[in-house]
């Protein structure tokens, strides 16, 4: 396809390259729309607003498994991993025991189940298990809320602490954060979730303004570099 137009935050329009060496698509024009909210994407698919979409939510994935009129599910393995990033220059999360408390407080299998249903698993590497160069790296921190509280006490926060989690406006990230929030609260870590557009959130994380965030790493080409 040949690029025609980019409408910032909305869509990219292209037309078929009739001089392409391989098989030509049956359609003349292609529009790629940017729809951040997963529920909105799926509604557009159901109502015919788009012909295809990816990154459907866990709940909509379960619906597709049961059949949705007019829709076909192509179930493929993802190369994406999600992970928490802490600003280790920040006064609070630079303390290793605070970071341990954040980790021990989370029941990762339960959080993944709540956020994604049966469409995801807990990562044990920074590289997705679907990639050919994946290898097991480490066991994730086991869920141990009492140990999380001990870590907080050792860090100097026996009565708990307040943190702010900065997120990009991406449904998957928000779903994960909201699933984790109650686990953190149970051990005394009160996390306020603040959602910004991608550019603002990225700037806050890159400049160190954010305490910590959740990011995702995709590897669509299969090339780790």
Predicted regions and their residues:
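Gly/Pro-rich hinge or "lid" segments in bacterial periplasmic/extracellular proteins
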Residues: 1-25, 29, 146, 150
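Ligand-binding "clamshell"
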Residues: 62-75, 207-212, 223-225
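Ligand-site clamp/hinge motif
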Residues: 17-63, 190
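Periplasmic binding protein-like
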Residues: 51, 182-225
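Structural transition elements
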Residues: 121-154, 171-175
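Periplasmic-binding protein-like
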Residues: 64, 72-86, 89, 93-131, 175-176
């Amino acid at each position: 396809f040949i690029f025609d137009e980019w409408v910032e935050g909305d869509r990219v329009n292209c037309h078929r390259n009739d001089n392409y060496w391989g098989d030509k698509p049956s359609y003349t024009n292609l529009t790629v729309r940017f729809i951040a909210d997963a529920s909105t994407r799926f509604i557009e698919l159901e109502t015919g607003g788009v012909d295809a979409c990816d990154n459907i939510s866990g709940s909509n994935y379960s619906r597709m498994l049961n059949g949705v009129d007019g829709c076909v599910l192509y179930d493929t393995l993802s190369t994406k991993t999600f992970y928490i990033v802490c600003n280790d220059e920040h006064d609070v999360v630079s303390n290793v025991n605070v970071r341990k408390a954040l980790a021990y407080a989370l029941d990762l299998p339960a959080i993944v189940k709540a956020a994604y249903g049966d469409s995801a698993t807990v990562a044990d590497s920074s590289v997705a298990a679907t990639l050919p160069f994946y290898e097991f790296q480490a066991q994730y921190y086991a869920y141990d809320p009492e140990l999380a509280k001990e870590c907080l006490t050792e860090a100097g926060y026996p009565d708990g602490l307040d943190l702010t989690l900065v997120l990009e406006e991406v449904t998957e990230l928000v779903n994960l954060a909201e699933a984790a929030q109650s686990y953190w609260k149970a051990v005394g870590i009160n996390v306020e979730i603040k959602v910004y557009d991608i550019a603002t959130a990225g700037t806050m994380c890159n400049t160190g303004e954010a305490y910590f965030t959740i990011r995702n790493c995709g590897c669509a080409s299969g090339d780790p570099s």
